[in-house]
């Protein structure tokens, strides 16, 4: 009865108004799983390949009709008749069918849509929520959110070089209170920016995108807003950054054009160390470029004992890239984006590898999202303890927070909020 009898993909729109793939997997008993695939703006060079049509007469070349056709054709032909509860077999079949190292033939967006939709169908067939189906009986930890309240870099049209300025409400008692604390700081920040005559327009991930040049000015606004909202920075709420440094690494230098700085790897490490010394920053993502392995090692040696150093473009949720990072002593945490690797099975393998190496994991959205809240379930399923899913604005971001609130309610007294346990 859990046999797959039909797979159907369609072209829908993501939060940026760009096409993406949505897949339905239907089982013999009528059960259906549905998944929509996210898309990034600042993408790592080593990510699995998203298949786009390239037809400039439709969606400026960003259509995904070919990826949908791959699902409805080759992939459906290969998977119809398989048992939806055999996730490893389903994913392995698609990887073999694609035949490339980076899923470029069928498209990672096609493969991932089917992988996640199959898992959802199987969970429903087993009458279990997705977090329980994937994570088993031990899935009970609600993650501390990294709430992106000021956007820069590729996520906003402003001079700020660093892509994301985030708050982490570690002192909350539960996810419900964590969301409330974040919301209160978010709205306080809006008032502070408005009072300073700055724009309160929002970026791709729902954070504000003010015309600020300096990283320190952005951090100062956030600290002031935390305090005015009634919380203590560095005790109840900490700060986190996503530099997305690959985006401004040019000709061997870190070009912070908004601040008029051109830094070597060593100078960039010193720049970040000074920020950590002056502000309650506990996590920095993609602080160095994806190919600057020596810079990553220097950064980890300098700050890794007290700051979570997250590899996103560095690792791209890929076990092979992660193994290199572990061997080189580069970073101490992995960002988890299911569409970077392209299947649920490979994602879980990477998470397990990171955990066994003593790395932390941070479940993450992409800047181009949909109402699909799968990553909320996966954050709980993996007990990773942290999630990045944007600000307290835009329904595509709030869908994940709201799902976490529902999961916490369903878990009842067994639910645990990661809270201060994430501090190094």
Swiss-Prot record:
Keyword terms of this UniProt record: Cytoplasm, Glycolysis, Lyase, Magnesium, Metal-binding, Secreted
Primary location class: cytoplasm
Subcellular location: Cytoplasm; Secreted; Cell surface
Gene Ontology CC annotations of this record: cell surface; extracellular region; phosphopyruvate hydratase complex
Reactions performed catalytically: (2R)-2-phosphoglycerate = phosphoenolpyruvate + H2O
Top-level class of the enzyme under EC nomenclature: lyase
NCBIfam families: eno
UniProt protein name: Enolase
Species name: Roseobacter denitrificans (strain ATCC 33942 / OCh 114) (Erythrobacter sp. (strain OCh 114))
Organism classification: Bacteria, Pseudomonadati, Pseudomonadota, Alphaproteobacteria, Rhodobacterales
């Amino acid at each position: 009865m859990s046999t797959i009898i039909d797979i159907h993909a369609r072209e829908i729109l993501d939060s940026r108004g760009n096409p993406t793939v949505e897949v339905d997997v239907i089982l013999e008993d009528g059960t259906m799983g549905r998944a929509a695939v996210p898309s990034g703006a600042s993408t790592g060079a080593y990510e699995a390949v998203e298949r786009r049509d390239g037809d400039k007469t439709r969606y400026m070349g960003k259509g995904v009709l070919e990826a949908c056709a791959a699902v409805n054709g080759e992939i459906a032909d290969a998977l119809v008749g398989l048992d939806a509860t055999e996730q490893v077999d389903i994913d392995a079949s698609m990887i073999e069918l694609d035949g490339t190292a980076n899923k470029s033939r069928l498209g990672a967006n096609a493969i991932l849509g089917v992988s996640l939709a199959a898992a959802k169908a199987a969970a429903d067939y087993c009458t279990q929520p997705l977090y329980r189906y994937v994570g088993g009986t031990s899935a009970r930890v609600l993650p501390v959110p990294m709430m992106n309240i000021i956007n820069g870099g590729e996520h906003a049209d402003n001079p700020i070089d660093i892509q994301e300025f985030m708050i982490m409400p570690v002192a909350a008692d539960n996810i419900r209170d964590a969301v409330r604390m974040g919301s209160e700081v978010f709205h306080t920040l809006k008032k502070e920016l408005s009072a300073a005559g700055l724009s309160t327009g929002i970026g791709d991930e729902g954070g504000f995108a003010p015309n600020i040049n300096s990283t320190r000015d952005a951090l100062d606004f956030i600290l002031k807003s935390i305090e005015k909202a009634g919380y203590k920075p560095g005790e109840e709420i900490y700060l986190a950054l996503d530099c997305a440094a690959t985006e401004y690494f040019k000709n061997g230098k870190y070009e912070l054009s908004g601040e008029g700085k051109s830094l070597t790897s060593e100078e960039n490490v010193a720049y970040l160390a000074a920020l950590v010394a002056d502000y309650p920053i506990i996590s920095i993502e993609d602080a160095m470029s994806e190919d600057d392995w020596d810079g990553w090692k220097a950064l980890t040696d300098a700050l890794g004992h007290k700051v979570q150093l997250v590899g996103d473009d560095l690792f791209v949720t890929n076990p092979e890239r992660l193994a290199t990072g572990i061997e080189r002593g580069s970073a101490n945490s992995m960002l988890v984006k299911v569409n970077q690797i392209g299947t649920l099975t490979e994602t879980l393998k990477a998470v397990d590898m990171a955990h066994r190496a003593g790395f932390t994991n941070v479940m993450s959205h992409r800047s181009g999202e949909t109402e699909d809240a799968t990553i909320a379930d996966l954050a709980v399923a993996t007990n990773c303890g942290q999630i990045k899913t944007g600000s307290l604005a835009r329904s595509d971001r709030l869908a994940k927070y709201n799902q976490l609130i529902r999961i916490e309610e369903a878990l009842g007294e067994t639910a645990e909020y990661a809270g201060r346990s994430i501090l190094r």
